[in-house]
Amino acid sequence: MSLFNLPKVDLGEDCEGGVUARPSSSSSSINNASDESTPLISKTNDEEKANIGISSTSNSPQEEQTKKPLFISILTLLISIPALVGSUCWPVLIASLSGVAVSAGSVELAHSLTFAITLSILSNLAQYHFHKCKKRPSDRGHWIKFGPFYLTAIAVPLATFDILRHILVDNSIWTIHSFISPAAYRPGCENENITCLSVMGWFSAIVFTYTGYACLLVGTIWAADLIPKIKKVWTQLRPSKKN
């Protein structure tokens, strides 16, 4: 065997002039660590984006649940403005303000439509408050948990009593010959205003109506937790007092 008959060695692309550059172990470990940390960082960013998306989507239903009963109560109050001023329904109020004569059939139809709309809105709002109150914590007692529902449920018959009285009188179901007269004004009183209201008129047009809508307003504010939210916003907007 000749001394010059040596085996060929593959120097590779990184070898020049017989000198090979070997990668150091520290640089390879750094590269491996960076490669491993890259997917972790991307995964963390994806999780943060997902959490932000979940929080944003979770806040929107809560805001909708808060605004929904408030809008319904405002709509109900707008419908009931005539009842609060003693005209029972919008057509009668508009006709009295404009000086236009309204037929008896139109008044009866207006009474029926107003009663149907008001009863449907208030009853559905009471059901909504009941299902919402079931999700409230019960550690503070039964009344604190279901108080908004009870107030709204009380508001349903009180706020619709005067309109129902008008419908019963229009259809001659409740007459002055009944055991309790449905007349809202005293006999012989010429002016149909608050000074001429009878006992029935005071209870139906004033006591029942205003108490019903007061219960509705308090129940809606209570169910939506508006007082704590207003206090929180107020404390955030107030400048901090420096000692």
From Swiss-Prot:
Gene Ontology biological-process annotations: selenocysteine metabolic process
Biased composition annotated in UniProt, kind: Polar residues: 30-43, 53-63
Keyword field contains Translocase: no
Cystine residue pairs: none
Sequence segments annotated as region (Disordered): 12-63
Organism domain of life: Eukaryota
Subcellular location: Membrane
CC per GO annotation: membrane
Membrane topology: Multi-pass membrane protein
Signal peptide: none
Residue intervals passing through the bilayer: 74-94, 102-122, 144-164, 199-219
Annotated coiled-coil segments of the chain: none
Keywords, sorted A to Z: Membrane, Selenocysteine, Transmembrane, Transmembrane helix
Name of the protein in its database record: Membrane selenoprotein
Organism listed in the record: Dictyostelium discoideum
Gene name of the encoded protein: msp
